[in-house]
UniProtKB/Swiss-Prot annotation:
Record-annotated FH2 domain positions: 124-438
Residue numbers spanned by region Disordered: 1-74
Gene expressing this chain: FH21A
Tree of life domain: Eukaryota
Protein's organism: Arabidopsis thaliana (Mouse-ear cress)
Protein name per Swiss-Prot or TrEMBL: Putative formin-like protein 21a
Record's compositionally biased regions (Pro residues): 22-61
Annotated InterPro entries: FH2_Formin, FH2_Formin_sf, Formin_homology_domain
Protein family according to the UniProt entry: Belongs to the formin-like family. Class-II subfamily.
Pfam families linked: FH2
């Protein structure tokens, strides 16, 4: 095998190989082992800053439109020395085929036109802010006159100028201004009232006086002194007593030095009534006089029922015999005990079962005693009366009679004005203080 010839600078002359096959070059060393690592996660996206949404842009500024100033109002009408004024009907529409042109301005720098009649002025509606000094005329306004009606006919007859609009058509009539002001003037302002007590009590008192239909103070004073039941009844007197002012309010009324008409209505009533000496005491005596006969009659009726029942119980021989037998039966049953040998017993302590057994014994031995209820006719009605209420009612009557006696004693020094009051208290001379039931 001949050597390979390579020409050039890179030619290498290899020695001739002697009968051996040349070995291949050694393989390159393996690369160093690489450590297996988990792939890194992708980096997170950068945080986004939260920003508040921007407000919407403001609308483009609109040019402010300057409105023209309204024209000044026309000057007020001059005052004329006329005894008769032209009053006009409210503006109404009159049917026309074609609208009229707008009227020219009237009464600006020129006096108003006058009618042919002396003292009559034709005026047209113009805006006026002056408040009328007359009372308001209450009516239902008609804004449109129906064709063929009375108002339509009057509007057509009273047209003063043909070039005036329908809304300005006015009519002229003769009116006396001084007479109108006399009848329809507002009058002087009422004086302010000066209440002496709280408004709530004053309102309640005034409403009660209206419901009771209280008369004039002069009539009331005369009726109280004479105790005339035809003028004031018991309901009205009781209402006056309940509404009577307290001691503090009465002192305020007595010390009041202002005008009479500046007080409330009920304060005026009681200010007139305070002229009567001890008016509240006299009102109570008057009320007691009206109620006296009825109260005494009803009290005597209830008291007589109780007295009759007591008399029947004390006089019934059958009831006494029954009580005697019950006592003997009880002593026999309770012999040898602490409850035996008794002289009497309480009816409430008896047992109902024992009474049933006693009635069986009584029916077999003394049947004539079973009709004892015939001797006690008033006992059932008397059992419904309460002795405590009767005693309280009797004490009330005695207390009222004592107050009456005190008022009569005090009225002796009041002079001739209280003479009628002393004479009408006749029921005190009957001597109820000496009655045995009192």
């Amino acid at each position: 095998m001949s050597p390979v010839e390579i020409s050039g600078a890179d030619a290498v002359v290899s020695p001739p190989m002697r009968g051996r096959v040349p070995l291949p070059p050694p393989p390159p060393p393996p690369p160093p082992p690489m450590r297996r690592r988990a792939p890194l996660p992708p980096p997170p996206p950068p945080p986004m800053r939260r920003r508040a949404p921007l407000p919407p842009p403001p609308p483009p500024a609109m040019r402010r439109r300057v409105l023209p100033r309204p024209p000044p109002p026309p000057p007020p009408l001059p005052m004329f020395d006329a005894e008769v004024l032209c009053c006009c009907y409210p503006p109404t529409r009159v049917r026309r085929e074609a609208p009229l042109p707008p009227p020219p301005l009237i009464f600006v720098g020129a006096p108003p036109p006058t009618c042919a009649l002396k003292g009559i002025v034709c005026c047209f509606p113009c805006p006026s802010k002056k408040k009328s000094s007359l009372k308001r005329f209450n009516w239902v306004k008609i804004t449109r006159a129906l064709p063929g009606s009375l108002w339509d006919e009057l509007q057509i007859q009273q047209v003063c100028h043909g070039d005036i609009e329908d809304e300005q058509i006015l009519c002229a009539i003769e009116l006396d201004v001084s007479e109108i002001e006399t009848f329809f003037s507002l009058g002087a302002a009422k004086p302010e009232k000066d209440p002496l007590i709280d408004l709530r009590r004053a309102t309640d008192t005034e409403l009660t006086l209206m419901l009771l239909n209280i008369r004039l103070p002069a009539d009331m004073m005369a009726a109280i002194m004479a105790m005339d039941e035809s003028v004031l009844d018991d309901d009205e007197i009781r209402g006056l007593i309940n509404l009577f002012p307290t001691k503090e309010n009465m002192e305020l009324l007595m010390s009041y030095t202002g005008g009479k008409w500046t007080l409330e209505k009920w304060e005026q009533y009681f200010q007139e009534l305070r002229k009567v000496l001890r008016v509240e005491s006299k009102l109570r005596v008057f009320y007691f006089k009206i109620q006296f006969s009825t109260k005494i009659t009803q009290f005597k009726k209830r008291l007589n029922v109780v007295n009759s029942a007591c008399e029947e119980v004390c006089s019934s021989q059958k009831l006494k015999e029954i009580m005697k037998k019950i006592t003997c039966l009880g002593n026999t049953s309770n012999q040898g005990t602490g409850r035996g040998v008794t002289v009497g017993f309480n009816l409430d302590s008896l047992c109902v079962k024992s009474m049933h057994n006693f009635c069986k014994v009584l029916a077999s031995e003394a049947s004539d005693l079973l009709d004892v209820h015939k001797d006690l006719q008033s006992l059932e009605s008397a059992s419904k009366k309460q002795l405590k209420s009767l005693a309280e009612e009797m004490q009330d009557i005695i207390r009222d009679l004592e107050k009456l006696n005190q008022e009569l004693t005090a009225a002796e020094t009041d002079g001739p004005d209280s003479q009628v009051f002393r004479n009408v208290c006749w029921f005190c001379s009957y001597g109820y203080f000496d009655q045995p039931w009192i």
